[in-house]
A protein has these predicted regions:
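Single-stranded nucleic acid-binding proteins centered on OB/S1-type folds
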Residues: 1-125
């Protein structure tokens, strides 16, 4: 169901293909405040989160548009401990000489249910 990329394969800017969509799983360790920016002549909302893999490596991820509301609802309902999410069909982008993750228009899906086998497995490790 998912085609996960490891954080190790994403952090090297020389290996970045900004056109390739992939899936990533990680623990949400930071959720920053909502921002508004002008993008292609329109005001858009965004929020940055930081994901961490099992080895402690972290990647920043920018969620755009409707994904902002989705992550805020998710954040409000966190019961205990750092949550684990799956970003399905996201992409890597080069920003300030670092690779960051980004949602891809209406294509990306955010999965966060504790019953998803990949999330259960991630949490058990």
């Amino acid at each position: 169901m998912f085609n996960f990329r490891s954080f190790d394969t994403l952090v090297d800017p020389n290996n970045l293909d900004e056109t390739h969509l992939f899936d990533i799983i990680g623990k949400v360790v930071e959720i920053h405040g909502v921002q508004e920016r002008e993008f292609q002549g329109k005001n858009v909302r965004l929020i940055e989160i930081v994901l961490e893999d099992l080895s402690g490596q972290q990647l920043s991820c920018t969620l755009w548009g409707d994904y902002v509301d989705e992550i805020l609802v998710f954040e409000a309902n966190i019961k205990a401990g750092p949550p684990v999410i799956i970003l399905q069909l996201c992409r890597g982008k080069l920003f300030n000489d670092k690779v960051v993750l980004s949602t891809s228009f209406d294509t990306t899906q955010i999965h966060y249910l504790d019953t998803i086998p990949a999330i259960v497995e991630f949490k058990s490790q």
